[in-house]
């Protein structure tokens, strides 16, 4: 499932690239995450609300209104059944699927992306990746001359963190402790201004979306923990 902000729609596509279909929506989608097999949560550019959308019917099952600013990145924690939503770029609202806010986490930076993995929260600004507990306490932060314009974060279930670097035009994988990293993909691999990434744990594949040419790449990866 992909967002196509320029055309105001969601794109549903099989992992092998076949059976592509579209869900037209009335706003420009920004962030998206899976709730279950049939439902995704979507935020919108300049929007102060979240839609829960049934991907089979294209219908909106719930609208969650948010106060405090426009919504940005979004991540759903299946373990806690809570949504983590960037609001106003400098805070994270933690809420249930009815929109009840459980807590608000503050960030010292303007956040570009967000991801949750079991009991860990990751977010980024343009040049740093932060690893926190679910109360927002920073465990480690990572920066490197190879990253400029972090736009998306994904994890592989064994602690590695994958990021897209928009201006550096590459994909970086960071070790579980944040001490080491590896440049995994570059322009030579077809990476051109990447804006989204997803690590599919079921088949060890990595999906990377380019902004400038609209190409979605599917790479096979070997999931192995980088050294700490």
Regions found by a protein language model. Give the residues of each.
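Eukaryotic scaffold repeat domains enriched in small/polar residues
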Residues: 1-228
